[in-house]
């Protein structure tokens, strides 16, 4: 089943929440009992137009003053997308109005009760998971290539 924004859910198992994302051979899947969102992106070049369209001034300044602007942009991008997925609206929310505040090993945002953790994978991917702030996040790697 999917909601009006395309977020999937299990039919007859609504208490089990999940979210998926994939990029260049990497698949991220989050499963739990609370709403969550996950996004993974390959760290690569980005379009300045996209930055100005989806980022607020603080984020734009962070991106362009960073020693690694690609990594900084995709950290913000995956956090924004994981947040939208956790809210169940995808990218249909005011992307520039949110503020991500570093808090310990994660980030808080304007939506009370949610936290976001960002991970770098193999120096090539940015992965963000948005969950209820009390939900524990456990990462497990599964290699489907048998290696």
Label for each model-derived stretch:
Residues 1-147:
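Core catalytic alpha/beta fold that binds nucleotide/phospho-ligands
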């Amino acid at each position: 089943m999917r909601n009006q924004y395309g977020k999937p859910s299990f039919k007859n198992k609504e208490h089990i929440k999940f979210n998926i994302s994939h990029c260049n051979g990497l698949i991220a899947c989050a499963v739990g009992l609370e709403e969550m969102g996950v996004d993974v992106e390959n760290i690569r070049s980005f379009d300045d137009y996209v930055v100005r369209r989806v980022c607020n001034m603080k984020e734009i300044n962070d991106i362009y003053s960073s020693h690694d602007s690609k990594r900084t942009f995709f950290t913000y991008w995956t956090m924004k997308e994981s947040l939208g997925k956790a809210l169940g609206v995808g990218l249909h929310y005011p992307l520039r109005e949110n503020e991500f505040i570093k808090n310990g090993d994660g980030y808080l945002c304007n939506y009370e009760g949610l936290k976001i953790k960002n991970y770098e994978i193999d120096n090539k991917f940015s992965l963000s998971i948005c969950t209820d702030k009390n939900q524990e996040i456990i990462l497990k790697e599964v290699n489907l290539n048998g290696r």
